[in-house]
Amino acid sequence: GCHAHISVWDGKKNKFLDKSDGLGLSKMAYNFLGGVIKNASSLSAFFNPTINSYRRINAPPTKSGASWSPSSISYTGNNRTHMIRIPDPGRFELRLMDGAANPYLLQASVLAAGLDGLKNKIDPGKPLDCNMYEDYQKYPDLPKLPDELDQSLEKLKNNKDMNDAFGKEAIDSYIKLRNLELKEFK
């Protein structure tokens, strides 16, 4: 697995920090987070770029009781069973990606999704305070992450915001490369 801690700074000022908020996030942070949540299925194509990536996401619980990989698109406070957790005020941890992710595409796609959230003032909804590994069936309407690479590539292909941010030619080339790898695997 892999994760990224995300905050936005203006000089020495953390723009994601709001000490008056219960989780310590500013309105800006929530909108940025909303963009990441909205685009999560498409981001999965960058964050989980191999067939084995989806074996990790869909892995059964281990002896510890968890795979420590998210499978639902959700966020929470300091709880590692969700795709996004807020461990401390002023930042959030995105837990979706794995070690096969290209670090440059990872950062660029998080920024593109976050900027979409800021531009469109996307509300991420309420955080869920539960153990998603045990309680996921209580949330049947909660969006799930793609089960396979080809599903996330299809989401990316049809995501106008990501196509605008990266350019359609770059997205098409990325998808073509991943599809060639899928074809070789089969």
Feature annotation, model-predicted:
Residues 1-128, 137-138, 142:
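Active-site capping/gating regions of soluble enzymes
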Residues 130-186:
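Acidic, glycine-enriched catalytic cores built around paired aspartates
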